Amino acid sequence: MCSSDLTIEFAIDPSLPVPGVAVGFSDTTGLTVASAGSVNDGVTLRMDSEGQGQATLLFRRLPLLKGRYSVTCFLTTEDGVHPYDQVEQCLQLEVTQHGLEQGVVTLPHEWQV
């Protein structure tokens, strides 16, 4: 399992409310397998007087199992409901693994015997 971070820079009309950002992880069929959004997480972004800002999303553990995934980034309204802009498949991930687990993610678990 790896860790990673993703920095998103944005520019918006400074007269608009502070926006939100979100990312979605999709598999090769286009199915969204995970997402994260600043609004959903209760994080208020900051922007300067010209409407520019940035946010860094930290993934301490990325529990994806082997496969190819793409990342789409969104700039949203302050309530996270409507996208102002999006960048489809801005990143491609190739995940490898050593074990035999099947599926999309590895679930935290313990065995008791």
Predicted segment positions?
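Localized sequence-composition bias
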Residues: S4-V113
